[in-house]
Amino acid sequence: MTTRPFIVIDLDNTFVDYTTAFKECLEQIGYDGYADAPDPSDYSFACEGWFDNVRTQPVLHRRAVGLGLYLRERPYPHAPEALDDLRHGGFRIVLATSRYDDQEDTDRWLCGMGFEGGRLDDLAECNTDFATIVRDRWTARLGWCHMSDKTALGADLTIEDNPHTLDRLMDKKMRVLVKRHAYNLPQCERAEQSGLGLSFDDWTQVPALAKRLVEENAK
């Protein structure tokens, strides 16, 4: 483990509320009836209360991005405070997202919300492997980057909601802290039963759970 433990935090539906912002965009587009839609039970949004097939959400997502979807997202309650606790608790933090369609919106959002984070994407121009640079050479306490394969970052702990990403992380015996949703309940159970992680509903739980998992990882 690194001298200062390294934590990767996902953005959409982990640190920030994607689903609510997506609903707002759907209403603007003219798709009424989703304001009270439940937490989706499938990551594809092809489930009760949402869409009939897996092809619908990607199309509407692209339209929503054009309407400023990522700029509309808000942190979950207590998430910024938990982030501050982790940063000041000696952890290196990188916000890692797979949203490659955001242009400059993520950068603008972080600036607008007052998160003074370094954009790490420019380091990809170096000859050294990008993931290695982020993992081993980033010494500031907060950074952010685009990263489709979060297992490559080799974090001491990854805070995540995507069931597919969670499975890949756990397949590699990497520690996870799962933001619980209806669509990732099997991963919550897997994390806890395997001893590779825990799950949470409220960000007030995160600092203590993260410290516990990192300490267990160090043993």
Where do the PLM segments sit?
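Anion (oxyanion) recognition and catalysis
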Residues: 27, 84-87, 170
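Charged phosphate-binding loop/patch that engages nucleotide di/tri-phosphates or the phosphate backbone
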Residues: 194-219
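Substrate-recognition "cap/lid" segment bordering the active-site pocket of phosphatases
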Residues: 96-170
